[in-house]
């Protein structure tokens, strides 16, 4: 999704906006439903000169009463436990040409998207990819192995967790990775 003044580099605030809108619909808290430019304004790092600062994004979500943290996962199995509790995971990935079939852009040195589920065949992961050209192309299926390579080789399994305080989450000792 391309936005004026932010364009294709707003993947982090766009993903965060998606997750906050999800929690707005789940909790009925309309204050969580923020437009992407609003989230981008709230997450902009003037030193970095961009919106991809992970702690800035989680801090922004926290200002609305959500629990938010940057974590390192070591497996997609850990992510499956969060998804089973209804918590989407915002993952930082990178890949080269031909390494992530079906991606809306051919390659990226750093891209954030939302893991929203796993296909019943176990071989594909369901994501919302903010690089899509328009809302209709945001939901995508990626090959599980290709996605894992893009995530673990790219960022070492870095992800944001954002969810309401008091939400039933997985046992942290087996689900949060090494952070």
Mark where each language-model region is.
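Sec/Tat-exported extracytoplasmic proteins
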Residues: 15, 19-27, 61-65, 83, ...
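Mid-length scaffold segments of soluble, non-membrane domains
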Residues: 45-46, 50-73, 84
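Noncatalytic regulatory segments and standalone regulatory/sensor domains
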Residues: 4, 118-179
């Amino acid at each position: 999704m391309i936005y004026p003044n932010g364009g294709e580099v707003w993947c982090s605030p766009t993903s965060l906006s998606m997750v906050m809108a999800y929690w707005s619909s789940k909790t009925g808290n309309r204050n969580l439903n923020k437009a992407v430019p609003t989230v981008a304004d709230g997450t902009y790092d003037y030193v970095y000169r961009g919106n991809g600062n992970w702690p800035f994004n989680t801090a922004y979500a926290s200002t609305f009463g959500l629990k938010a943290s940057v974590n390192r996962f070591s497996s997609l199995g850990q992510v499956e436990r969060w998804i089973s509790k209804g918590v989407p995971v915002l993952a930082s990935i990178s890949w080269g040409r031909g390494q992530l079939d079906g991606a809306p852009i051919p390659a990226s040195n750093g891209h954030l998207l939302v893991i929203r589920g796993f296909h019943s065949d176990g071989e594909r992961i369901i994501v919302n990819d903010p690089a899509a050209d328009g809302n209709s192309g945001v939901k995508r299926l990626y090959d599980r192995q290709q996605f894992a390579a893009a995530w673990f080789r790219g960022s070492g399994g870095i992800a944001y967790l954002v969810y309401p305080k008091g939400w039933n989450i997985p046992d942290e000792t087996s689900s949060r990775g090494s952070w």
